[in-house]
């Protein structure tokens, strides 16, 4: 297994800007279906043959599902599931399955996220952490930005002592095409608050999540 370590290369300001770039679709679903038909023809296929008759509609529906995070918001997602609590020790959810799509080739990114925070008077429903990961993953992404968005969303929502996010993923654009390197994994991290400032806290988190990735 090869691990490709990518540092946090996107600033918080760039991350916030990226959250506000969603635009209202300017084409209809019928136009999207026609575009897929055109792609099939361009590939030398016949979209009117039996096996492909409904493929354009299916592709559009699949892409809409895979990018449904654009139509979700943190407020709707949380639904008030933030609670006052005196807890001040690390809360960690490990091995959250991540399915995203790379924005360069629209091919799958498959991996797992490890998310921790140290409360500062507020805690969040555990399932909501997974849902935050899901919301940002269901968009066209790069792994670096996905990692930062999850960390900064939780930091903004809870104002905790700190947030830590690590994502380990394999990118089909490196496996199925291009360099064709199955078995390579990309690891990204984002540390906020005490996780960035205190080496011992960061090391405790890394020790808890350190394990061999196994997504077979």
Curated annotation (Swiss-Prot):
A GO molecular function held by the record: GTP binding
GO terms for biological process, alphabetical: one-carbon metabolic process; tetrahydrobiopterin biosynthetic process; tetrahydrofolate biosynthetic process
SUPFAM superfamilies: Tetrahydrobiopterin biosynthesis enzymes-like (SSF55620)
Catalytic activity: GTP + H2O = 7,8-dihydroneopterin 3'-triphosphate + formate + H(+)
Record bears the keyword Cytoplasm: no
Top EC class of this enzyme: hydrolase
Pfam families xrefs: GTP_cyclohydroI
Cited InterPro entries: GTP-CH-I_C/QueF (IPR043133), GTP-CH-I_N (IPR043134), GTP_CycHdrlase_I (IPR001474), GTP_CycHdrlase_I_CS (IPR018234), GTP_CycHdrlase_I_dom (IPR020602)
GO cellular component, one term: cytoplasm
Enzyme Commission code(s) on record: 3.5.4.16
Pathway info: Cofactor biosynthesis; 7,8-dihydroneopterin triphosphate biosynthesis; 7,8-dihydroneopterin triphosphate from GTP: step 1/1
UniProt keyword terms in alphabetical order: GTP-binding, Hydrolase, Nucleotide-binding, One-carbon metabolism
Claim: Transmembrane helix is one of the keywords in the record: no
Transmembrane segments: none
PANTHER family, per the entry: GTP CYCLOHYDROLASE 1 (PTHR11109:SF7), GTP CYCLOHYDROLASE I (PTHR11109)
UniProt-listed HAMAP family: FolE (MF_00223)
Assembly: Homomer.
Similarity section: Belongs to the GTP cyclohydrolase I family.
The protein, known as: GTP cyclohydrolase 1 2
Organism annotation: Nostoc sp. (strain PCC 7120 / SAG 25.82 / UTEX 2576)
Encoding gene (name): folE2
């Amino acid at each position: 297994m090869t691990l490709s370590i990518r540092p946090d290369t996107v600033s918080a300001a760039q991350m916030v800007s990226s959250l506000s770039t969603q635009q209202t679709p300017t084409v209809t679903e019928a136009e999207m279906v026609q575009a897929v038909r055109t792609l099939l023809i361009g590939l030398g296929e016949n979209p009117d043959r039996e096996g492909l008759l409904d493929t354009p509609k299916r592709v559009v529906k699949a892409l809409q599902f895979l990018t449904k995070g654009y139509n979700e918001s943190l407020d709707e997602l949380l639904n008030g599931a933030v609670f006052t609590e005196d807890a001040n020790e690390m809360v960690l959810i490990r091995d959250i399955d991540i399915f995203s799509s790379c924005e360069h080739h629209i091919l799958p990114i498959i991996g797992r996220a490890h998310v921790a925070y140290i409360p500062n008077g507020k805690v969040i429903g555990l399932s909501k952490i997974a849902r935050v990961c899901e919301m940002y993953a269901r968009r066209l992404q790069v792994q670096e930005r996905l990692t930062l968005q999850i960390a900064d969303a939780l930091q903004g929502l809870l104002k905790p002592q700190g947030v830590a996010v690590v994502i380990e993923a394999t990118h089909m654009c490196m496996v199925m095409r291009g360099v064709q390197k199955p078995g390579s994994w990309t690891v990204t991290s984002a540390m906020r608050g005490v996780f960035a400032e205190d080496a011992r806290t960061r090391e405790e988190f890394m020790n808890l999540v350190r394990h061999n990735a196994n997504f077979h």
